[in-house]
Amino acid sequence: MTITIDAVILAGGMARRMGGNDKGLVELESQPMIKHAIDRINPQVKEILINANRNQKVYSEFGFEVISDQDSGYLGPLAGMITAMSHTQADYLMVVPCDCPLLPRDLVNRMLAQLTTADAELAVASDGKREQPVVMLLKPSLRASMKAFLDAGERKIDFWYAKHNYIVTDFSDQPNAFINVNTPEQKQQLSEAIANEKNNLRCK
């Protein structure tokens, strides 16, 4: 039986540390941040959902379904995940943020292989030093558990998944994979990392 996997790109936050700018639409290397994430994740999944709570018309121009949180109170990544789980019929949902332009090209395969081998409910990515809670492969059937957690006033993703049978997938071989953008300095760091990756590809 073929396993189906959809992805949701989370672009629904308020981006306070970026001065309120919509992070998914911030330009990086001549294209919006979310376009980098789309290019990385699209070959790895069946369908893409974009979770956005503003600029929905702009996001729709990327050619994928745009979904907004069912609660308009900017309740964080969990709210976006809950919404996405109600919009997918796939066996698994791959969750990624809009501001990680160097996501691994083998992200889904590695996480799925480890998840199924361990017979776990979800897999969380790690850069080898820390877990990345918003880079997660999970079963949509976990929606009820996540919604109950959020409805109870909880927000921390790692507190939620600690209640479940989860595994951590190590991507320490790709140290730049989960660099994201919260400050102008991090944006510069990412630009340099992207340039280095392009140079390495040319040398191969």
Swiss-Prot record:
Gene3D superfamilies: Spore Coat Polysaccharide Biosynthesis Protein SpsA, Chain A. Pfam families: NTP_transf_3. Keywords: Cytoplasm, GTP-binding, Magnesium, Metal-binding, Molybdenum cofactor biosynthesis, Nucleotide-binding, Transferase. It catalyses: Mo-molybdopterin + GTP + H(+) = Mo-molybdopterin guanine dinucleotide + diphosphate. One of its GO terms (biological process) is bis(molybdopterin guanine dinucleotide)molybdenum biosynthetic process. Its EC number is 2.7.7.77. It comes from the Bacteria. Mg(2+) binds at D99. InterPro entries: MobA-like_NTP_Trfase (IPR025877), Molybde_CF_guanTrfase (IPR013482), Nucleotide-diphossugar_trans (IPR029044). The N-terminal domain determines nucleotide recognition and specific binding, while the C-terminal domain determines the specific binding to the target protein. This is Molybdenum cofactor guanylyltransferase. It comes from Shewanella piezotolerans (strain WP3 / JCM 13877).
